[in-house]
């Protein structure tokens, strides 16, 4: 997640619920719609890097992380940015539970090699000092442009990285594909998403329904998605 100096024009917001309206203009994002979206939905090396920062007393160092991509999907000329609402909801609600901490302490990769005081610190970690800058969700974007900029203490920003990439990659892929189909079909055609039976699991199906609609589809066969959104 590195890029040239950003030129984002959106305004920053604090990640906590009592903050001002965030970039992208969404006033209230609540929680994520996917129950799998938790602080543990990350790569192990993010936790080991966080521990290294903590041991070196660099965990509170001010830092900036930026999200970008290198190539448009489908050999196309543009991408539609999506997933920002989920990113913001995830960051606002980010908090490790006692159960999460107990699990991390029990793992072979961390428990036997990590100072126990690190887990105590981790249990109190939050996103109070995290700020986000972003282009508006649904914007046409291009490769190597900064899309999201995360500012805050180094350790927490590191722990957010993997999940942010996950929440935006698939969302942008589906939204872009839907927009391409809408452009090809024209404005007068009715487009219905019917991918549930072939989707990559329930969470993939729900996401596909949501972001197909964002990309220009008129409806979905997915009854649950219709109820949720």
List the model feature ranges, each with a label.
Residues 2-228:
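Ordered alpha/beta subdomains of enzyme catalytic regions
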């Amino acid at each position: 997640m590195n890029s040239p100096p950003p030129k984002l024009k959106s305004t920053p917001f604090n990640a906590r619920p009592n903050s001002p309206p965030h970039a992208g203009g969404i006033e209230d994002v609540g929680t994520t719609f996917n129950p799998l979206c938790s602080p543990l939905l990350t790569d192990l090396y993010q936790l080991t890097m966080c521990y290294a920062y903590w041991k070196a007393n660099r965990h509170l160092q001010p830092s900036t992380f930026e999200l970008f991509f290198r190539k448009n999907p489908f050999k196309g000329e543009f991408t539609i940015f999506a997933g920002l609402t989920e990113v913001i909801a995830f960051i606002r609600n980010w908090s490790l539970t006692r159960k999460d901490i107990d699990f991390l302490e029990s793992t072979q990769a961390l428990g036997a090699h990590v100072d126990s005081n690190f887990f105590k610190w981790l249990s109190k970690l939050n996103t109070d000092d995290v700020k986000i800058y972003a282009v508006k969700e649904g914007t046409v974007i291009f490769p190597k442009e900064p899309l999201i900029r995360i500012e805050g203490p180094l350790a927490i920003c590191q722990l957010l990285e993997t999940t942010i990439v996950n929440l935006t990659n698939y969302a942008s892929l589906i939204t872009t594909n839907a927009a391409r189909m809408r452009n090809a079909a024209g404005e007068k055609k009715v487009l219905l998403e019917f991918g549930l039976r072939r989707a990559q699991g329930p969470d993939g199906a729900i996401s596909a329904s949501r972001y197909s609609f964002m990309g220009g589809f008129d409806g979905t066969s997915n009854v649950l998605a219709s109820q949720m959104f």
